[in-house]
């Protein structure tokens, strides 16, 4: 495998922030591995367009790898962590939407709690030095003004 500045895992890579971050990191000669479950909460075609946006930046087939996987899938996550010696993990994946969380709480628990717990465990097991976690503005609740 080619020498890169860093080997970086980005979860939620088909989201707005994930795709722009991936494109920037690829342009800086990093190996970026992107994960996303491509669920239908947001437009699937929009997510696919974002992946094409990332692909347009990669200069060689080795600079970006995409895996369609849910973070609660321990086996697939373990394979991915085994295949790459990540320097950095950036967790942007989450099930969005406060109203949806009330209608389908199990989806939230699987994605946002079990999935993130798996990321934490694999970061510990694979001795990842840097984990970056971004959350949603929804955690702040309603504005009082």
Model-derived features: positions:
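N-terminal Rossmann-like NAD(P)+-binding domain of SDR-like oxidoreductases, especially those catalyzing
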Residues: 1-145
């Amino acid at each position: 495998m080619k020498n890169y500045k860093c080997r970086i895992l980005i979860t939620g890579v088909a989201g707005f922030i994930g795709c722009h971050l991936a494109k920037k990191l690829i342009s800086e000669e990093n190996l970026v591995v992107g994960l996303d479950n491509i669920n239908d909460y947001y437009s699937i075609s929009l997510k696919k367009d974002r992946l094409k946006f990332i692909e347009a930046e990669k200069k060689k087939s080795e600079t970006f790898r995409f895996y369609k996987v849910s973070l609660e899938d321990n086996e697939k996550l373990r394979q991915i962590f085994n295949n790459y010696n990540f320097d950095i993990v950036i967790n942007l994946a989450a099930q969005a939407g406060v109203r949806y969380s009330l209608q389908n709480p199990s989806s939230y628990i699987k994605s946002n709690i079990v999935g993130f717990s798996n990321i934490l465990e694999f970061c510990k097991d694979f001795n990842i030095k840097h984990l970056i976690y971004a959350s949603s503005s929804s955690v702040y609740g309603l504005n009082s003004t």
